[in-house]
Amino acid sequence: MPCACNRNNWRKWIRPLLILLYALAILVTVPVCIWEFQKLKVGIHTKVWFIAGIFLLLTIPVSMCGILQHLVHYTQPELQKPIIRILWMVPIYSLDSWVALKYPKIAIYVDTWRECYEAYVIYNFMIFLTNYLTIRFPNLMLHLEAKDQQNHLPPLCCCPPWAMGEMLLFRCKLGVLQYTVVRPITTVTSLVCEILGVYDEGNFSFSNAWTYLVILNNLSQLFAMYCLLLFYKVLKEELSPIQPVGKFLCVKLVVFVSFWQAVLIALLVKVGVISEKRTWEWQSAEAVATGLQDFIICIEMFFAAIAHHYTFSYKPYVHEAEEGPCFDSFLAMWDVSDIREDISEQVRRVGRTMRGYPKKKCFPGDPDHNEHSSLLSASSQDSSKPSSPVGLYQGFGQTITSQSPISIANLYEEILNEIPEEQQRLYSGQDITMDIPEEQPRHDTGQDVVHLPYRQELPYKNHYQDHIQTVTSRYLLSSPKPSDDIVIDFSDSPEGSDSSTDS
């Protein structure tokens, strides 16, 4: 039974419902803040937490408005699903920092999960770009192969360039994916080190675990951002309709600013600007540094929410006729099967590469072809040299160049293999002639005719296109006038077949 609140009905009450929930949240949080200020002694910690709460209340509605509009106008799941995941970064960052600011003892546990989502956002931005390109250019691998070779950007400009095509796309995605894996691992490691008492957050010293984890996270994050930047550099013109610069800056600034300001605050602790002499209600200088970081993030997220609202706008996706039923878009927001499949595919490909197995071949005409499959075999391509646009594929078409000379006998065998076994036995040893009529085929007496739909691509049509030099094959591979059928005649007369072959 269809949902009673589908189409436009549920869109009429979803906005008032969220406004009501937001009003209830304000009615709960404001009295709590007032109660805190009614205490006999209100310190700097409480005042900072209260100011951060004001920015939180301003940030949440701006972010949720953008998320809600995408859910209401959920017409392009391939693009809007990663956008919604990116938009969730701002409220998660803001709420997480506000809670950590109020309860400093659990800050290490709360902040680590925030940092894990940071890696998730970077990868979703890469998915957003690749999904857009796949929609716009179904043969994306061919398009990349035809472009001029792109050298590495500084500081990796001395490294051998990645071959244009599948290798470039695979390594860029893998470079972003590694941060999605490294960040959760370092997060769990930091929690274990905190329990063991060897983490010592905010203290630059080679005797604690925090310093090493910061260096590892920094290198992993920088390489992920480098891969994103290289990917944008190669496909700058193709990505221009979605204005990727603003989107890239929104993601990059939130991630980079939050990370590097944490490093800067840690340096202030190291040089003594933030010291044990004045910690207010915090227990140590490191706790002061963590609280300062959380407070700044609460303020920054308000401006980030405004930037995200306009940069990742819902307006390009407003198509009333294509909007889905109730809750489908909401449930799709939590579906991570695409990420799981993509990670599994990347892991399998890395495993095949390490074991020396050849990569899977998947041609553009393959119905199972999608962005998670390897679209072009690069096993015969030198990874240190740029690929040529002329080779396995000619231009952007689907012509496949054969690597060995072809004879008429081979063509005969290929055609015969496509004929049912009964007719193979019946006409074994006879010559085959081909005819493509301009009008409807005529069924002559004494001939057996096998009809193949004209629009069905023959298996040998492309494979031998550049090698068969007979009149018959040239006539077959030319562009005939539209007709319903291609007729393959099995003639009993040897003279007809000889004339066809000799010509």
Curated annotation (Swiss-Prot):
Residues 358-391, 479-503 are annotated as: Disordered. Residues 494-503 have a biased composition (Polar residues). Residues 373-388 have a biased composition (Low complexity). Keywords: Membrane, Transmembrane, Transmembrane helix. It is found in: Membrane. The chain crosses the membrane at residues 17-37, 48-68, 83-103, 115-135, 212-232, 254-274, 287-307. It comes from the Eukaryota. GO terms for molecular function: transmembrane transporter activity. InterPro entries: Ostalpha/TMEM184C (IPR005178). It is a multi-pass membrane protein. GO terms for cellular component: membrane. The keyword RNA-binding does not apply. It holds the Pfam family Solute_trans_a. Its main location: membrane. Possible tumor suppressor which may play a role in cell growth. Belongs to the TMEM184 family. This is Transmembrane protein 184C. It comes from Rattus norvegicus (Rat).
